[in-house]
């Protein structure tokens, strides 16, 4: 199986000179020259390049006294119902009823709809996130939204499952 890092960048297309979509490997991307707060730009690029502090990345690392945690056990610190990855954190996680993620998403949705009234709100979470990240009209509100969501996640300790949950028991040969 290949690496799951940077999957938000794989297969992306840019508008070519002729106006049609084409794959461009080397190009100054629109989100790198934003007139935006540097912390928002860093949050935006951390999602694209998988350098954020969500469990899907942090728990892949070996740390002192802890082996890497298998991906399926890198659960969300709020709901523990799904892997805490970019799509779950930014689009899917509901947390609990008093959680700030839902109002943040609603505010971002209103802002995006004001900028791009005919924006297509995909039912597929990954498609929606890809559209939000790569739309050239939306990087400022999306970068702020990503920054705010990552701040919410960093304010709560990460869920680290006990190793016995995902480590097979040693079989003793008699």
What residue spans do the PLM features occupy?
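Family-specific functional microsites
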Residues: 5-174
């Amino acid at each position: 199986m290949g690496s799951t890092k940077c999957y938000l960048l794989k297969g992306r297309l840019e508008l070519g000179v002729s106006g049609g979509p084409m794959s461009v490997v080397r190009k100054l991307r629109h989100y790198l020259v934003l007139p935006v707060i540097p912390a928002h730009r860093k949050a935006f690029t951390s999602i694209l390049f998988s350098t954020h502090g969500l469990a899907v990345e942090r728990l892949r690392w070996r740390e002192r006294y802890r082996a890497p945690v298998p991906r399926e056990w890198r659960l969300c610190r709020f709901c523990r119902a799904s892997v805490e990855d970019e799509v779950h954190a930014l689009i899917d996680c509901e947390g609990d009823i008093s959680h700030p993620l839902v109002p943040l998403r609603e505010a971002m949705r209103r802002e995006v709809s004001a900028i791009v009234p005919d924006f297509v709100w995909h039912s597929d979470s990954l498609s929606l996130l890809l559209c939000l990240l790569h739309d050239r009209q939306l990087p400022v509100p999306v970068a702020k939204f990503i920054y705010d969501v990552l701040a919410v996640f960093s304010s709560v300790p990460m869920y680290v499952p006990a190793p016995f949950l995902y480590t097979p028991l040693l079989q003793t040969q008699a």
